[in-house]
């Protein structure tokens, strides 16, 4: 489907740095990943912040629910606290801080809208309003994904300029949304690697390029590299093409 698959750093270079932090994103650039996959939630004061979970407990070791905290409150905590090595303090980033720093550095930025557990009312409009400020560059480089198809529908309704990918990790999730609707709204599918390997024909029949997550071994990387349905592989580690 294209000449060169992309390799996206899953929450930044999260194998060697704390996920979704500036350090992880800096290292993804230094190690020449093609792009970044990251997760976005909405704070009490309606700031778009980059974190995977709905709470800060796992990463900052302080139990705060993102939707009930202000940005100032969340900025106080060190999101490298969970990491197995001592490193410099890593403050939670806003999406704007990230885009200002990294939009120019990567080919593709995959923003996962984390509305599968909490609705975060209005998050889609805030996302579209923010990325519009970056003009054509954002249209070229930004891809929104979500397990919640309604969030992708909302982005489509607000502004259909931006790429969208449907995330799923079960057959049931995939079959809940009609093929026609997926093909209308989305330019990509984002299946879990194991579900893709189990039901390849079911997924390929939509004829949409695939962004696979999460690729964890060199062998799998090489295997998917030979699959012309795959547009990008999303991985915690950096893999290189090996020529036998």
From Swiss-Prot:
One of its GO terms (biological process) is lipid metabolic process. Pfam families: GDPD (PF03009). Disulfide bonds: none annotated. One of its GO terms (molecular function) is phosphoric diester hydrolase activity. InterPro entries: GP_PDE_dom, PLC-like_Pdiesterase_TIM-brl. It comes from the Bacteria. Transmembrane segments: none annotated. Residues 5-244 form the GP-PDE domain. Keywords: Hydrolase. PANTHER family: GLYCEROPHOSPHODIESTER PHOSPHODIESTERASE, CYTOPLASMIC (PTHR46211:SF1), GLYCEROPHOSPHORYL DIESTER PHOSPHODIESTERASE (PTHR46211). To glycerophosphoryl diester phosphodiesterases (EC 3.1.4.46). To M.genitalium MG385. This is Uncharacterized protein MG293. It comes from Mycoplasma genitalium (strain ATCC 33530 / DSM 19775 / NCTC 10195 / G37) (Mycoplasmoides genitalium). The lineage of its organism: Bacteria, Bacillati, Mycoplasmatota, Mycoplasmoidales, Mycoplasmoidaceae.
